[in-house]
Amino acid sequence: MKTNLLNYDLQGLTRHFADTGEKPFRAKQVMRWMHQSGAQNFNEMTDLAKSLRHKLNEQASIEIPKLMMSQESSDGTRKWLLDVGTGNGVETVFIPESDRGTLCISSQVGCALECTFCSTGRQGFNRNLTAAEIIGQLWWANKAMGVTPKNERVISNVVMMGMGEPMANFDNVVTALSIMLDDHGYGLSRRRVTVSTSGMVPQMDRLRDVMPVALAVSLHASNDEVRNQIVPLNKKYPLKELMAACQRYLVKAPRDFITFEYVMLDGINDRAQHARELIELVKDVPCKFNLIPFNPFPNSGYERSSNENIRVFRDILQQAGFVVTVRKTRGDDIDAACGQLAGQVQDKTRRQQKWQQILIGQQG
């Protein structure tokens, strides 16, 4: 079986070449060809000796996930569905803005965490993505988006906020992050790469030590009672532990704040009292808030907060001195908005079946 070199960061690729009797510097050459030139076969790598190209063709491969579908929203948002085998597909979304181009990348086929307001969570869970399947999303998007008139890459920022919980696929995500940051890969700065987590505290500590990129935390509640209901992981790592982990992370973080993501659910977490509880909760954590109007999906059981409730909630936080943004809903006409990514998941958890039974019971 051939070795897919897309699974290696520079350290791994260097080790691979050394193990196969080749000069270690070849790793940098091959990495640049794969990630900066978008090469898909070794014959394109003209600065490698023919004998090495032949050897690589015999022993190795560059396997990119295949494109299943591409869509473009009326607002310029683009979504790609990529085939990761055995009937599974993951979604990657590009969001254009005036000062940046952000790519939202998936880390798992489905998600095991069962956050109740998230479409991905309803799809169940199949498996972790490999490092090649994670970085392959950036490879595809770079190929599709090209460069600006100034010969700069259109994709300037990456957020690990697609399908799945990145911290639950720690090793493969870290390898992909290493490729993103490497000057022989995509050359992104740590400040422009963000990992989002629902609050896996031990993995937050590990990421701080090995790959401290910008951090976003899917908070979504101001107290344990509400968060236990909508983010079940909170029962394992309650808010007090999560806030302490955020403080520890900031010691090595490239930014001096944590971004707290907060989906606005009508009547659940969007009242003035919740905003005041939030202020008390995060008082020792330098942070900013990203309020996310809930993006409906069929049979979710939730409603989007009213614009008035979102405004009042935002104003309370701002008056307390916090930086607060209300996320614009982008790509909702192609189901590319936050919380809508579902891909194609061959569920191994029977979660889809469970939700169908619940819905049938409600209808009965």
UniProtKB/Swiss-Prot annotation:
Give the EC number: 2.1.1.192
* Name of the protein described by the UniProt record: Dual-specificity RNA methyltransferase RlmN
Active-site positions on this chain:
E91 (proton acceptor), C338 (s-methylcysteine intermediate)
Signal peptide stretch:
none
**Annotated positions binding [4Fe-4S] cluster:** C111, C115, C118
Q: Which cofactor does it need?
A: [4Fe-4S] cluster
**What family is this protein classified in?**
Belongs to the radical SAM superfamily. RlmN family.
- PROSITE patterns xref list: RADICAL_SAM
- Keywords, alphabetical: 4Fe-4S, Cytoplasm, Disulfide bond, Iron, Iron-sulfur, Metal-binding, Methyltransferase, rRNA processing, S-adenosyl-L-methionine, Transferase, tRNA processing
Which BP terms does GO give this entry? rRNA base methylation; tRNA methylation
Q: Does the keyword Transmembrane helix apply?
A: no
Please explain the role this protein plays, according to its UniProt record. Specifically methylates position 2 of adenine 2503 in 23S rRNA and position 2 of adenine 37 in tRNAs. m2A2503 modification seems to play a crucial role in the proofreading step occurring at the peptidyl transferase center and thus would serve to optimize ribosomal fidelity.
Q: Name one GO cellular component term.
A: cytoplasm
Additional note from the record: Reaction proceeds by a ping-pong mechanism involving intermediate methylation of a conserved cysteine residue.
Q: Where in the cell is it found?
A: Cytoplasm
Disulfide bonding pattern of the chain: C104-C338
